[in-house]
């Protein structure tokens, strides 16, 4: 069957989900029947077609009244502020991809369900009372038919969780720290301007800016045994896409750097193929733009100190990789629900 999807919020992730759907050749498995976005439809069409990070969309895009066309596919455009007013029942929506970045509670998910959707997938970390939080490639096999309201976690969680799992399974992690080196985001300023976070009052293109992160909480959600044993900090840097994560962990078993690299390389070629990639090429962040993997391990940067302290550098396209995981998780939810 083809999964009927509606997208709520057509920003960076929402638009990349549509692009990834068509570029990955999964149009026969998923069809987008509606997009709810407060912006005007002409602007939606323009930004879907032309993207500073990802270039021109290869498919023809046009807008006619309340419809957006991708090739010959018609997508209904909505501008509803109230979740309860969305016509999901009328449109026969199987899964809503809520890509607003605003909603993430069970109450918000239930509002989509009340409007007629069968399932909801948030594109960001949700509240603890959701039915499941999925990092595809790690725990999607835990999805059940009764799971209606699900979170796909965050781009950085999807990047680092597979690597942590691999290192923990192999060597036994005792504790760790994470530094996220993240591209600038829409909540920063072009030039100095007011913001509740005084660091984010400053021009995004001119500074490396420390910001708060809940990544440590995201890690312990998947690995409760690491509660109070993982810490994370984050900085935003003057690039518009691609993120690097510096992961340091202390492990129980002694290990060498080449052994760590071999472990991660084999995982990329085997059980985590398509989710984790591995490289030893002398690449920089822009080289990972439009990469569909959740994580790309940079083997040239792996270090081991005292046989028990491992440091790795992991890259991800925080937009494109995550958008592809949204599609993977959507299909996983539909598979368990509708088989």
From Swiss-Prot:
Substrate binds at residues 154-156, 200, 213-214, 236. This is D-erythrose-4-phosphate dehydrogenase. The active site is at 155 (nucleophile). It catalyses: D-erythrose 4-phosphate + NAD(+) + H2O = 4-phospho-D-erythronate + NADH + 2 H(+). It is an enzyme of class 1 (oxidoreductase). Optimum temperature is 50 degrees Celsius at pH 8.6. Relatively thermostable. Activity begins to decrease significantly when E4PDH is incubated at 50 degrees Celsius for 5 minutes. Homotetramer. It is found in: Cytoplasm. The keyword Nuclease does not apply. Catalyzes the NAD-dependent conversion of D-erythrose 4-phosphate to 4-phosphoerythronate. GO terms for biological process: glucose metabolic process; pyridoxal phosphate biosynthetic process; pyridoxine biosynthetic process. Optimum pH is about 8.6. Belongs to the glyceraldehyde-3-phosphate dehydrogenase family. Epd subfamily. The gene is epd.
